[in-house]
């Protein structure tokens, strides 16, 4: 039987930015030779992997198969009542993710500081925990953003908060696949990503100037419409079935 391996991140950037990952890759990189098919969760992750392995494994199969998103579970979690009160007169911005260097929350806070100089009708909610939490809270205080930013910590059900928001903002330095963007889209939120994240978050289009987008953004008065991502998930099922059928060929 043929063997497949999944690529879940931008390996090229992780090697560059994370010492521990650099060591792991050095010791385990030859293991890739034992696989017949390389599946990446986004084109960005695949391009990065192919660049790292450009001088070998040219006869192998390379595929992009994104992660499946369980929208039924999301729909169930949306039924839970939020335990925070947001100001509906303001633009409520949210982000969800680990508070680590990769996710670029420090970049987000710098942009929020600049935004606060030109408009006051917004609030940012940060959902997640991680090694950089205290550092980011200190940055928030140093930038005098306490009235504009709330850290909600790690939440088992972030969707009960997402349904109260207007705009989801992802500021990662790099991704594997920006699943959280599609999850936010399924809830009915507008989504914002910088241009360099497009290759990790199809079909979402990124913007060249994030700050300009935030300055001009106007919240919609339309009722949020839930998207079950049916076409997206069906395409993944087809790709997986094709992969499994091919893997069972002798």
Functional labels for PLM-detected ranges:
Residues 35-61:
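A short, active-site helix/loop in glycosyltransferases that binds the activated sugar's phosphate group
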Residues 181, 190-194:
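Short hydrophobic beta-strand element within catalytic cores of glycosyltransferases
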Residues 91-114, 131-137, 179:
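A conserved mid-protein helix/loop that constitutes part of the nucleotide-sugar donor-binding site
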Residues 15-16, 50, 63-89:
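Acidic anion/phosphate-binding donor-loop and adjacent secondary structure
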Residues 154, 173:
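Aromatic "clamp/platform" in nucleotide-sugar-dependent glycosyltransferases that forms part
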Residues 219-250:
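A charged, aromatic-enriched C-terminal amphipathic alpha-helix characteristic of glycosyltransferases
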């Amino acid at each position: 039987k043929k063997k497949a391996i999944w690529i879940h991140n931008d390996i090229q950037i992780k090697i560059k930015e994370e010492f521990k990952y650099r060591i792991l890759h050095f010791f385990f990189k030859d293991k890739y030779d034992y696989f017949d098919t390389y599946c990446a969760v986004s084109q960005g992750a695949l391009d990065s992997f192919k660049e790292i392995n450009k001088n070998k494994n040219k006869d192998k199969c390379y595929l992009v198969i994104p992660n499946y998103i369980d929208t039924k579970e999301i729909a169930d979690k949306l039924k839970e009542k939020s335990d925070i009160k947001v100001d509906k007169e303001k633009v409520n911005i949210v982000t969800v993710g680990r508070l680590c260097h990769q996710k670029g929350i420090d970049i987000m806070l710098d942009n929020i500081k600049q935004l606060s100089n030109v408009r006051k009708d917004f609030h940012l909610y940060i959902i997640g925990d991680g090694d950089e939490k205290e550092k980011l809270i200190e940055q928030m205080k140093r930038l005098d953003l306490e009235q504009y930013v709330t850290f909600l910590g790690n939440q088992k059900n972030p969707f009960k908060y997402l349904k109260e928001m207007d705009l989801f903002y992802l500021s990662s330095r790099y991704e594997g696949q920006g699943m959280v963007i599609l999850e936010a889209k399924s809830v009915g939120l507008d989504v914002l990503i910088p241009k360099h994240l497009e290759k990790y978050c199809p079909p979402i289009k990124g913007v060249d100037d994030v700050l300009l987008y935030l300055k001009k953004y106007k919240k919609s008065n339309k009722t949020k419409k839930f998207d079950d991502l049916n076409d997206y998930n069906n395409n993944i099922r087809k790709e997986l079935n094709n992969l499994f059928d091919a893997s069972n060929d002798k």
